[in-house]
C-alpha cells in the first residue's frame, strides 16, 4: 500500500510513499479507504499528511489516465471528492509538505487547515496553465477556499513555482521549517 497510517496519541499521520505520489485509480481508492478509517476512529483526532522523499505529490498521473481512458472519469471524480472531503473533515488537518507539491498535490494542500512546508527544497505550483489543462470547478473551489486572492490569481495564471519562503509570504503555507522539523512541527 502506498499510504501508511501511524498514530501518535491523538494524531493520525498519513505518509504517502509511492514515488511521485500521483493520483491513479488505485491510489484514489486507497485515500478514501484511509480517510474512512480515520473518520471512524473514536475520540478527538488531528490528521497530518506528508509525502516521502522529495515529493509531497505531483498530482494526477496523466500517463495512467491516457492508458486507462475508461477509468479516468471515475478517478477524477474520486480526486474531486478527496479534495472536498479534506476541506470539510470534522477534525484538524495539517499538511507536512516535505517536497514538491504540484498540480493536484498542491490542490490537496489547500484542503488542510494548516500547512507547513520545507524551507530549503521543494516547490508548490499549479502548472495547469503550462500544460494547457484548465482547472475544473471543483479544483478551483478547493484552491480558492484557502489562498489569498492575489496568490490564487498569480498561481493559476502564471504557473509560478513557490519555494518555501515565497509560499510563506504568499499565504500558501503558515509555517516553513528545516526538513527534519517539518513533520515534528506538524
Locations of regions flagged by a protein language model:
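Glycine- (often His-adjacent) and acidic-residue-rich active-site loop
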Residues: 4, 51-85
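Glycine-rich beta-to-alpha active-site loop
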Residues: 83-131
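Hydrophobic/aromatic residues within transmembrane alpha-helices
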Residues: 49, 108-110, 167
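Conserved CoA-thioester-binding segment of acyl-CoA-metabolizing enzymes
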Residues: 1-52, 84
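Short helix- or helix-capping micro-motifs
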Residues: 58-60, 143, 151-160
Amino acid at each position: 500500500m502506498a499510504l501508511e497510517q501511524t498514530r501518535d496519541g491523538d494524531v493520525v499521520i498519513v505518509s504517502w510513499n509511492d514515488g511521485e505520489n500521483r493520483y491513479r485509480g488505485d491510489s484514489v481508492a486507497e485515500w478514501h479507504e484511509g480517510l474512512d478509517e480515520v473518520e471512524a476512529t473514536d475520540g478527538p483526532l488531528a490528521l497530518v499528511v506528508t509525502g516521502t522523499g522529495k515529493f509531497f505529490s505531483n498530482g494526477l498521473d496523466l500517463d495512467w489516465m491516457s492508458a486507462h481512458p475508461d477509468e479516468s472519469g471515475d478517478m477524477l471524480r474520486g480526486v474531486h471528492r478527496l479534495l472536498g472531503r479534506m476541506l470539510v473533515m470534522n477534525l484538524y488537518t495539517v499538511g507536512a509538505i516535505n517536497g514538491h507539491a504540484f498540480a493536484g498535490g498542491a490542490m490537496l494542500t489547500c484542503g488542510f487547515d494548516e500547512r507547513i512546508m520545507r524551507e530549503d527544497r521543494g516547490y508548490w505550483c499549479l502548472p495547469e496553465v503550462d500544460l494547457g489543462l484548465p482547472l475544473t470547478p471543483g479544483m478551483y473551489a478547493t484552491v480558492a477556499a484557502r489562498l489569498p486572492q492575489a496568490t490564487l490569481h498569480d498561481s493559476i495564471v502564471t504557473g509560478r513555482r513557490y519555494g518555501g519562503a515565497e509560499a510563506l509570504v504568499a499565504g500558501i503555507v503558515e509555517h516553513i521549517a528545516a526538513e527534519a522539523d517539518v513533520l515534528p512541527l506538524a
